[in-house]
Amino acid sequence: MITQLEKDLQLMKMHNINAIRTSHYPNAPIFYKLCDRYGFYVIDEADLEMHGSVSVNNTAHWDWSDYSGIALVASNKMFYKGILDREKICLARDINRPCVIMWSMGNESGNGHNLTKAAEWIKAFDNTRLLHYESVHNQGDTTDAPYDVVSRMYPSPEDWSKFPENKKEKRPFILCEYCHAMGNGPGDLEDYHKVFHSSPRFCGGFMQLLMKSLICRLCLTACGTFQRLMPA
């Protein structure tokens, strides 16, 4: 019996989709077995996301001008063991899966000493795979960071096209998220794909999302009426 998951993977292959990022947590074990079978490249992402952990240093709210405002947990030593545990769980379970070509530290968790130490542990534990983390980029020059790719999410095609101009940076570039849209969109795929083909340094990207945004549900409101929702 073919499961819905397998049908989704078959559909992706039919449309020349060859890589999956398990945002933002490891997937069910059967997923990796199917990816082995169908030949998908997988970025296996640990269950680590800390959007709400703003620091109390004058950033009690989300501030796009200071992305480090969500870096309290990433920096405070009392959280290091918990962060490392989540990384270890991901690696220990999936290290023998051929489809996994890259580990991802997590998603949008700021950056700090805890993440750097955990990344160093991962590199020592498994030096056969690449390591990914997007949220390090707010720290300025990251050419000496323990990550094997330069990762971004949602830059404009114009800004993205300028990345190879940085002569200090020798790593490949990857869009870990782009073109997140619901309904009749997005309309900028061609612009991004032109950039992908403009330099061998661009590895491609991961659209957010494939199926989930198309699920509609009904829920009962406080007034007793039904309202159709489209969850992100």
Model-derived regions: residue spans:
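Extended substrate-binding grooves/exosites of carbohydrate-active enzymes
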Residues: 1-232
